[in-house]
Amino acid sequence: TFPLFTDLERELAKFKNTEKALVFNTGYMANVGTISAIADKNTIIFSDALNHASIIDGCGLSRGSVKAYNHCDVDELKYLLKEVDRNTRKLIVTDGVFSMDGDIAPLDKLYELSREYNALLMVDDAHATGTIGSGHGTAAYYGLEKEVDIQLGTLSKSLGSVGGYVAANSVIIDYLVN
């Protein structure tokens, strides 16, 4: 790895308040690559119905099964989670700010459900970084930087560059690298 990439990943991890970050060539590839790597055939992915196309494509390319819940409907998500065995691998994935209407995901409630039902929580902050709260994204907006398992984003919107990234703990980032 080039030192420049290592420096960028370190700064992104600091920016998102996570242990590590990993850069991708685009935000689209960050979503597709992360979801398809994490979700195996034994994983159920719970995806907001209005998630970005890159999330939908990542879910489709993964080997996991997908259950879409109505937009920002935490009650429906809870109902769907209740139907699944607690020991089944689960991934809840959402946009932080939805690009088509500007809604902010109820990340605080999604976090509570992720812990109650033993699920990983992933948020795509492509449209949240630089636009809400301190500019650090949805997890920071809700004060959940250390709690959200996976934060993704792009460098091509408010950060004015190219590329994408995933920020998470060392175990998740090392898994994605290997």
Where do the protein language model's features map onto the residues?
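A glycine-/small-polar-enriched, mobile loop at the entrance of the PLP active site in fold-type I
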Residues: 1-6
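Conserved PLP-anchoring active-site segment centered on the Schiff-base-forming lysine
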Residues: 34-53
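Conserved active-site segment immediately N-terminal to the catalytic lysine
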Residues: 118, 138-156
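Active-site phosphate-binding strand-loop segment of PLP-dependent enzymes
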Residues: 67, 71-123
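Short loop-beta-helix segment that forms the pyridoxal 5′-phosphate
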Residues: 9-33
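Short, structured coil segments at secondary-structure junctions
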Residues: 41, 61-63, 147
